[in-house]
Swiss-Prot record:
Disulfide bonds: none annotated. This is Secreted RxLR effector protein 114. The RxLR-dEER motif acts to carry the protein into the host cell cytoplasm through binding to cell surface phosphatidylinositol-3-phosphate. Residues 1-19 form the signal peptide. Residues 43-76, 108-138, 389-408 are annotated as: Disordered. A motif (RxLR-dEER) lies at residues 46-66. Its main location: secreted. It comes from the Eukaryota.
Length: 556
């Protein structure tokens, strides 16, 4: 009887398991289309439900009674059918394939929506088929709007720097299209109206007027159609893979800048060069704006301090005025390098050019203009102009003095000296070099050179500002006791020191001695500079002091 009960219970349990399996299979087939993962969950839940240990399945029979355990041989773990597992695997594979297919479809759709370049359409201008230029407002390369922030973030800075700003501005304004490789698309037969539209669209608007083009192009130059076409042809010939706007902007800017520079400087004086003219090599003239000697501004006060007077005297003022206006460059010693026998063809091309180099534009501007605009000048007139220019090349028509030919005759007219201050060969050599180096403001006697050479060769107290130097000059002036002799000594320089016309000072011994003393003080400044500059000629000199007050010194 007990065995029959156990058999009935086993049959009921088996029937329930089969019904549950059929229900689960129908449920999986119904939900596989929505989500393949749901079938796996159902299988797992069913396996868990059927594989639970029978020891844990207790049937409640009240608080005290419990059902007896099932025999281990009756309730076994049910096996899942192979057909059920195969169906689940197929459904899972189909779900994954559907997801992959949908993702691929979305990716292809995104790729198909990217901006594509439109091929340029052909159009006809003035009877010719032309290809339209790429849109000047659309670049082949996109530029990020937030470049500044991106650069700052990458460089780990809080704010964009000026260099970043310039780089971003350049990247935004750069034209990434290749320059044209064939000739210009604008025909010469195009009408003015069409040219205006074409040129403005293709060329002018591509230029950055504020940053890449000289503003004089927009302010002064008005270009004709022919000039624009010529520029376009010039730009097309050397074209290479470089931005069009940069190439054209540089070319226009450079050409305009050169043109304006030539217009502004058409009357500027050009430094002469040494050219071979009619078999002779003329040397370039010294710069007329540069003197070999620098002149101090406070000469009267320096003279008053050195000569120990309370204030500058009239002689000191006259001497300072003349020294300031004097030209220290040597006047030309030879005749003009142009020979009258030069052929007319050479004179036609060489003389106007050489005249333009030598004419003083302040004094001979009319002559220069006539040489440019008129062709009726004769050879005699041009040679006359050249001769007049040679004479007026310097403020002093001729050199103040030259090297003496007869030293004994010159010494007899010179100032009185002490017996130890004799004129030897060394003095003659230094004196000749000093006279030939400058156009001296005052006449220099060999006796004066002998005394100054002795002073400059002192180991100490040789500076022009030294008190013993003043005493030596004053003593030499006092040796000249006769006014008639002093007047002869100062003969060439008397007007520069005592004045002229109504301002001339009385010619008396006191004024003559002061004038001679002033002359020696000024000349020693220049002689001191000359000796220290020519140490190959004057040897054994001490170290040159740096005077805080000076009258004349060399500019080199």
């Amino acid at each position: 009887m007990c065995g029959a009960h156990f058999v009935a219970i086993a049959l009921l349990v088996a029937a329930g398991c089969q019904t549950a399996a059929e229900f689960d299979q129908d449920d999986i087939q119904q939900t596989s289309k929505d989500d393949s993962m749901a079938s796996i969950d159902l299988l797992q839940s069913r396996n868990l439900r059927e594989s639970r240990d029978s020891k844990d399945d207790l049937l409640s029979a009240g608080d005290e009674e419990r059902t007896p355990p099932f025999p281990s041989g009756v309730l076994k773990e049910p096996k899942v059918a192979d057909s059920t597992m195969a169906a689940a695997n197929v459904m899972r594979t189909e779900g994954e394939a559907s997801a992959i297919k949908a993702a691929s479809k979305n990716l292809n759709q995104l790729k198909s929506n990217k901006p594509q370049r439109i091929a340029p359409a052909s159009r006809s201008v003035a009877g010719q088929v032309l290809h339209s230029s790429p849109d000047s407002d659309k670049s082949l390369v996109s530029v990020e709007n937030e470049q500044l922030l991106v650069l700052a973030k990458r460089r780990r800075t809080k704010h964009p720097t000026a260099m970043m700003t310039n780089a971003v501005r350049s990247a935004e304004q750069h034209d990434y299209r290749l320059a044209p490789t064939e000739s210009s698309t604008l025909p010469a037969q195009a009408s003015d109206g069409q040219l205006s539209k074409q040129l403005i669209t293709q060329k002018v608007l591509q230029l950055d007027k504020k940053k890449h083009v000289d503003e004089s192009l927009w302010r002064e130059e008005l270009m004709t159609v022919d000039e624009v076409l010529h520029l376009l042809e010039t730009f097309d010939k050397p074209a290479h893979p470089t931005a069009v706007n940069v190439h054209e902007a540089n070319a226009i800017g450079i050409a305009t800048k050169k043109l304006n520079y030539l217009r502004r400087n058409k009357r500027k004086r050009i430094a002469p060069t040494s050219n071979n003219v009619v078999g002779q090599v003329p040397h370039a003239q010294p710069d007329p704006d540069k003197s070999p000697v620098l002149v101090a501004k406070d000469i009267p006060s320096v003279l008053a301090k050195r000569l120990r007077t309370d204030h500058p005297t009239a002689i000191m003022e006259n001497a300072a005025r003349f020294v300031t206006q004097h030209n220290y460059r040597l006047a030309p010693t030879g005749p003009s390098t142009i020979i009258a026998a030069t052929p007319n063809s050479q004179l036609k091309y060489h003389l106007p050019g050489q005249k333009a180099l030598h004419l003083d534009k302040n004094e001979h501007a009319g002559d220069l203009k006539s040489l440019r605009n008129e062709e009726s000048h004769t050879i005699e007139h041009i040679l006359h102009l050249r001769e007049r220019n040679d004479k007026s090349a310097h403020t002093t028509a001729e050199n103040h003095q030259s090297v003496p030919e007869d030293w004994n005759t010159v010494s007899a007219k010179g100032p009185k000296l002490l017996s130890k201050d004799s004129i030897n060969e060394k003095v003659k050599k230094v004196h000749a070099a000093f006279v030939e180096a400058f156009n001296l403001p005052f006449h220099q006697y060999p006796e004066e050179t002998a005394m100054m050479l002795k002073l400059v060769q002192r180991k100490t107290k040789s500076s022009p500002n030294n008190g013993e130097t003043y005493d030596a000059f004053m003593y030499m002036a006092e040796l000249q006791q006769h006014s008639s002799h002093l007047r002869k000594l100062l003969g060439p320089d008397l007007k520069m020191l005592l004045g002229t016309d109504k301002t001339v000072l009385p010619i008396k011994l006191e004024n003559l001695q002061e004038a001679y003393n002033v002359k020696l003080v000024i000349m020693y400044d220049l002689f001191f500079e000359f000796c220290h500059d020519r140490k190959d000629l004057v040897e054994g000199l001490p170290r040159k002091p740096k005077p805080n007050q000076w009258i004349l010194k060399l500019s080199t």
